[in-house]
């Protein structure tokens, strides 16, 4: 089951794709702004193996893109806004290999350079057993740390509860550890395959990707002042401004 939420109105749709370890809740600020500006509809998804969506037998950018394509196949006017892993998936969808037409992609903060050691470390994480916690507070604190949201999200934020789950063994992250299998996908191939040229954005203080790295792939790179890796959470209004630069066809 691919959990998703929809809002807004109109023909145009924005598919909102979060990053590794996050959930669709990170888009709440941008969703509100899309509604306020009347830009169209939005579809926010918990990626497979995250939040309220079920796990897969295996994980790859292509497999995740195929899952999402089935969700938005009937959308006639589709734009994708993806953060980190979501940016990778957005580029894959924009290839038109999955039977859908994407009119524009905003790729936010994708980590484009992976060392062999980093890839090996991520793949080792994919094989680790689930870690259990004794309380909701403990596991929620851990989630905020591993997702990089510790300073951007208040502990009482409502959507945080969907990032963790409880069963007989105790509390755990809702994320399937095997989702780390996606690390190491060929970014340059995805960029080259995208039919509409992607627009890239990063926070000024993002430690995972530099402006110069993104400029190797596009001349449309926007740096957002005062923000880190989770710029879509920290400064959703800046992201909305970039969305409004697309040829929306109004």
Where are these regions (language model features)?
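A short loop-to-beta-strand scaffold at the N-terminal edge of the catalytic core in hydrolase folds
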Residues: 1-7
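Conserved HGGG/HGGXW glycine-rich cap/lid loop of the alpha/beta-hydrolase fold
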Residues: 7-54, 247
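Active-site loop/oxyanion-hole signature of alpha/beta-hydrolase fold enzymes
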Residues: 31, 38-81, 241
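Gly/Ala-rich beta-loop-alpha elbow adjacent to hydrolase catalytic centers
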Residues: 82-86, 90
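Flexible "cap/lid" loop of the alpha/beta hydrolase fold
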Residues: 92-96, 100-134
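Conserved alpha/beta-hydrolase catalytic His-Asp/Glu region
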Residues: 134-187
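Catalytic histidine-centered segment of alpha/beta-hydrolase-like enzymes
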Residues: 227-240
């Amino acid at each position: 089951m691919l959990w998703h939420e929809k809002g807004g109105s109109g023909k145009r749709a924005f598919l909102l794709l979060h990053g590794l370890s996050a959930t669709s809740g990170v888009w709440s600020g941008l969703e509100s702004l899309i509604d306020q500006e009347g830009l169209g509809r939005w579809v926010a998804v918990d990626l497979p193996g995250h939040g309220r969506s079920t796990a897969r037998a295996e994980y790859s950018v292509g497999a995740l893109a195929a899952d999402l394509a089935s969700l938005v196949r009937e959308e006639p006017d589709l734009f994708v806004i993806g953060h980190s892993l979501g940016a990778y998936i957005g580029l894959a969808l924009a290839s038109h290999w999955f039977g859908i037409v994407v009119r524009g992609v905003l790729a936010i903060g994708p980590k484009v350079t992976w060392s062999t050691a980093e890839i090996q470390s991520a793949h080792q994480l994919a094989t680790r057993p689930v870690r259990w916690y004794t309380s909701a507070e403990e596991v929620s604190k851990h989630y905020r740390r591993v997702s990089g949201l510790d300073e951007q999200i208040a502990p009482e934020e409502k959507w945080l509860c969907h990032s963790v789950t409880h069963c007989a063994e105790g509390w755990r992250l809702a994320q399937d550890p095997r989702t780390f299998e996606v690390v190491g996908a060929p970014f340059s191939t995805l960029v080259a395959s995208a039919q509409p040229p992607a627009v890239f954005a990063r926070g000024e203080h993002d430690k995972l990707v530099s402006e110069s790295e993104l400029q190797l792939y596009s001349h449309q790179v926007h740096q957002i002042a005062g923000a880190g890796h989770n710029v879509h959470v920290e400064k959703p209004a800046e992201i909305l401004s970039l969305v409004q630069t697309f040829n929306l066809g109004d």
